Amino acid sequence: MDKKTARLRRAAKTRHKIHELGVVRLTVHRTPKHIYVQIIKPADGNVVASASTVESMLKQQLKNTGNKEAAITVGKTIAERAKAKGIAKVAFDRSGYKYHGRVKALADAAREGGLQF
C-alpha cells in the first residue's frame, strides 16, 4: 500500500464516522502550494462556506501560499465565514493527513476564531 492509498483509506474511515454522527464537517485538502478548507452540511453534502489560498483576497495578504502562516490565515477566514452563516460547532475532517504542521495550524486558528471541534 502506497502513501496516497493509505491516506485515502484513513480519510474514508473518518468521513464514515462523521457521517454517522450527522454533524457539519470542516474538511481540509492540502497540496504543496495551497491549502483548501470547506464546511459541508451532513444532510445534502452542500458546501456552506469555503476558504483557500487560491482566493485573490487571501493571496494578496500572503507572501507564500504553502506554509503555516497561510494555513493560519485560511483558518481565521473560515471561522469568520462560518460565524456569518451561524455555524459554531463542526467535526474536523483532516482527510487522512497527519494532525501536524499546516493542518494543525489551520485547526488552531479556526478554534481561536470561534469554531468548536
UniProtKB/Swiss-Prot annotation:
A single GO cellular-component term on record: cytosolic large ribosomal subunit
Pfam families for the chain: Ribosomal_L18p
MF annotations from Gene Ontology: 5S rRNA binding; structural constituent of ribosome
Gene3D superfamilies for this protein: 3.30.420.100
UniProt KW keywords: Ribonucleoprotein, Ribosomal protein, RNA-binding, rRNA-binding
Subunit structure: Part of the 50S ribosomal subunit; part of the 5S rRNA/L5/L18/L25 subcomplex. Contacts the 5S and 23S rRNAs.
Family, per entry: Belongs to the universal ribosomal protein uL18 family.
Functional description taken from the UniProt entry: This is one of the proteins that bind and probably mediate the attachment of the 5S RNA into the large ribosomal subunit, where it forms part of the central protuberance.
Protein name in UniProt: Large ribosomal subunit protein uL18
